[in-house]
Amino acid sequence: MLSRLIAVVAAVMLLATFSYSSDTSALKPPPGAKVAIVEFLDLQCPDCANANPLIKEAAKTYNIPVVRYDFPLPKHNWSFDAAVIGKYFDSKSKPLGAAWRDYCFENQPAISPENLRSNAERFAAQNKVTLPFVIDPEGKFAGQVKADFAVGQRVGIEHTPTIYVVSNKAYGKPFVEVVDRSKLYSIIDQMKSETDGSRASAEKPVKATRVAKK
């Protein structure tokens, strides 16, 4: 009984330490953007597929970038390999990599470890891109996926999709996790307003106050 209690206390302390030591430095817009959407995703995750159209539409509506990190969960049997293929297509062009992720989400129920390669070949043919017999001979793209996953671990990601609206504002919290996706647009509105407001405050000259002598 005592050993079990000690184990529980140790686990709680470890979780608390992890929570306080999370690194959120990755939660920021790319250079040149004031506001962006950051998403940690798994290509085999049904909820990621459900969220994808909303995220794309929000990015288009507000003309803001989406920064995606591959976070393939160990319980899924083809998401890591699909993410590696995605990094290969990213190396050809970012829009092509984004289109591959869209393809995976749209065809998710029919994809399996056995037919992932044939799906990648079909996608490549549709987009007039060559798919080499060995996609990642040196493990470079697998390394990129692992690096994305490591970023997620440092942030403290526990599930997919995890979505943030991030900004470059100088004051207050520069990122907000979108827990309720129905509030995505209102969170973006608020973040854009706060970002523009903080910039205006920072640029507004401070008037000198003259104190009258008695």
Residue ranges and their predicted role:
Residues 1-5:
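Positively charged n-region of N-terminal signal peptides that target proteins for export
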Residues 6-17:
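Bacterial N-terminal signal peptides
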Residues 9, 20, 65-67:
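Domain-level signature for proteins that mediate thiol-based redox and metal-cofactor handling
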Residues 20-35:
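A short beta-strand-turn-helix
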Residues 29-31, 59-61, 78, 154-159:
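Extracellular/periplasmic catalytic domains that process cell-envelope and extracellular macromolecules
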Residues 36-38, 162-163:
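Catalytic His-Asp charge-relay segment
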Residues 38, 43, 49-125:
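Structural alpha/beta surface segment adjacent to cysteine/selenocysteine redox centers
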Residues 121-214:
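C-terminal cap of thioredoxin/glutaredoxin-like
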